A protein has these predicted regions:
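Hydrophobic h-region of N-terminal signal peptides that target proteins for export
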Residues: 9-17
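N-terminal catalytic cores of secreted or lumenal carbohydrate-active enzymes
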Residues: 21-192, 205, 212-223, 227, ...
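Structural recognition of the beta-strand scaffold that forms the well-ordered cores
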Residues: 33-39, 79-85, 136-140, 193-197, ...
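Noncatalytic carbohydrate-binding groove/subsite architecture in carbohydrate-active enzymes
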Residues: 182, 212-355
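Aromatic/acidic polysaccharide-binding cleft in carbohydrate-active enzymes
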Residues: 321-410, 419-427
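Carbohydrate-binding surface patches
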Residues: 425-468, 498
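Solvent-exposed beta-hairpin/edge-strand motifs
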Residues: 463-480
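C-terminal beta-strand-rich structural cap/linker in extracellular carbohydrate-active enzymes
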Residues: 484-506
Length: 506
């Protein structure tokens, strides 16, 4: 009841008076390293299409930093691309017990040799990303290669909550990751800056076998695997950083959630020296940071801020950094009808923009990534693809969701610093939200979300008194407003309803 009272009060305030926002130049926060998305699972198919024009269109939407003749961005300029390093379920076919659309190939073969012709569709998009200037690449795995797993599969099939990896294969799995990363660099010229050996090891779906690749793991199993991976990468002379642990839920980083102590309290488990069995802070290629996913923690809306502030404070306590590496719409996101059925409109775009704002402003996330770059009839893709022949061919349609991410990713570039923004109004997650950044070239960027159904008066200024002319780029449901340049301003504007506007200083 208390939350409802606060919300109603702030909505009234935002309607009745202008929202004055000031960038506080003496209050820098975190460095922003990148914004991204993953190639799972569509790119393995799209990268093999005969229609190269469609591939180029998708790549431009995701990666391009160019503008058209009218000054409108051609794409959203993602700065990190997540590559799903496969486990071999595709070679198993129906015996994999995994849906055809989510199986993956593996570079490692049954006889122990490596086939560098595998995963060609995904590797084509690695090249297309690099050609368009994407500076960072991350490899992630959902399962060990099937030759190393306890059940011979890349899915868990309800076998329990421990890692699906033979006890004598930890070093083999680590060696595979190092060899695959080195091989892709040698064959394709793609350097992986980061690798995540496990993905959502605390997710209860991983225990059941969800008809996609995945494996649970306890904290001790993760620590053992990361130590082996660290040794394998050092032995092969690789500079790739090893990340932990792509948690399925922010609550698992802080405490236990729908699981036991063996999978909870991950921040202190991996980065407190008191955790002698699981401490990873002494490994030279494991950065002091936690990587997690923002699923399940976005409702009720007041809780979204609360859990992220708890995360920020705990991360700071242990001297760490935080990256958010996956999000899509799930069943509990009831405000926009859950994940089923694709949505091209601002309804989903604004909902996700609000989550991005919370992750950057209240959790101090230094990196932010969406889940799938391309999907079908579910709210998990930035781009919607249509196919009638099981992804052998098709065509793609962009969404307001993709362009809304672009309001951040296209303009906030690697190395930017976020700054505190003060306001004359109370924070209102149903009204106007503003976050501000300064790129390495000195230009200011402010991303302003108007979540409300009405026009909102807005004023932007800087605490040092400097005056700027701001170029504005807007995404809304208005036809053609997808990162559209909509003019310049000295700082005072009427924000259209249900819109996102990025302000760039001159």
């Amino acid at each position: 009841m208390r939350y409802k009272w606060v919300i109603s009060l702030t909505v009234v305030a935002s309607v009745c008076q202008a929202a004055d926002f000031k960038i506080e130049v003496n209050e820098p926060r975190q460095t922003i390293h990148h914004f991204g998305a993953s190639d799972a699972w569509s790119m393995q198919f799209i990268g093999l299409w005969d229609n190269e024009a469609e591939q180029e269109k998708i790549a431009d939407w995701l990666f391009s930093l160019e503008n058209d003749a009218q000054g409108k961005p051609k794409g959203i300029g993602l700065s990190i691309w997540r590559f799903n390093l496969g486990a071999g379920s595709a070679e198993q076919g129906k015996k994999s017990k995994i849906n055809p659309g989510t199986r993956t190939e593996c570079f490692l073969t049954k006889n122990g040799s490596y086939d560098w012709n595998k995963q060609p569709g995904q590797r084509k998009f690695l090249q297309m990303a690099k050609q368009r200037g994407v500076p960072y690449f991350l490899a992630f795995l959902n399962s060990a290669p099937v030759y190393f797993t306890q059940n011979g599969l890349a899915t868990n099939t309800g076998r329990g909550g421990t890692i699906n990896l033979k006890d004598d294969c930890y070093d083999d799995f680590a060696r595979f990751m190092a060899t695959a990363v080195k091989g892709i660099e040698e064959h394709d010229g793609i350097h992986f800056d980061y690798i995540c050996p496990v993905n959502e090891p605390d997710g209860h779906w991983n225990w059941l076998g969800p008809k996609q690749e995945g494996s649970p793991a306890t904290n001790r199993e993760i620590a053992r695997l990361v130590r082996e991976t660290s040794k394998a990468f050092i032995k092969q002379g690789l500079t790739t950083k090893i990340l932990v642990d792509e948690s399925s839920d922010l609550r698992c980083l802080l405490a236990t959630h729908q699981t036991s102590w063996e999978r909870g309290y991950q921040i202190r488990t991996f980065f407190s020296k008191d955790s002698t069995n699981t401490y990873l802070g002494n490994l030279p290629n494991v950065p002091r940071q936690m990587v997690g996913h923002s699923y399940w923690t976005n409702t009720p809306v007041p809780y979204m801020r609360e859990i992220r502030e708890q995360l920020r404070d705990t991360i700071a306590k242990y001297g760490l950094k935080f990256w958010q590496t996956e999000l899509c719409i799930m069943g509990n996101d009831e405000e926009i009808g859950g994940g089923g059925g694709y949505d091209f409109s601002m309804k989903t775009a604004l909902y996700v923009a609000r989550v991005i704002h919370h992750d950057l402003v209240f959790a101090d996330a230094e990196s932010w990534s969406w889940w799938r770059a391309v999907g079908e009839d579910y709210k998990d893709g930035l781009i919607r693809v249509y196919t009638s022949d099981r992804m052998k061919s098709g065509y793609a349609v962009d969404s307001r969701l993709m362009w809304a991410l672009g309001n951040f990713s296209r303009f906030i570039r690697p190395g930017a610093t976020r700054y505190v923004v003060s306001s004359s109004a109370e924070f209102d997650p149903y009204g106007v939200m503003c976050s501000a950044y300064r790129n390495a070239d000195g230009r200011w960027v402010a991303v302003v979300i108007n979540y409300s159904q009405s026009v909102q008066p807005f004023s932007l200024s800087i605490s040092d008194g400097q005056k700027y002319e701001w170029q504005m780029y807007r995404t809304s449901d208005v036809s053609g407003e997808t990162l559209k340049p909509v003019g310049k301003t000295a700082g005072k504007q009427q924000l259209p309803p249900r819109s996102i506007t990025t302000f760039i200083s001159d």
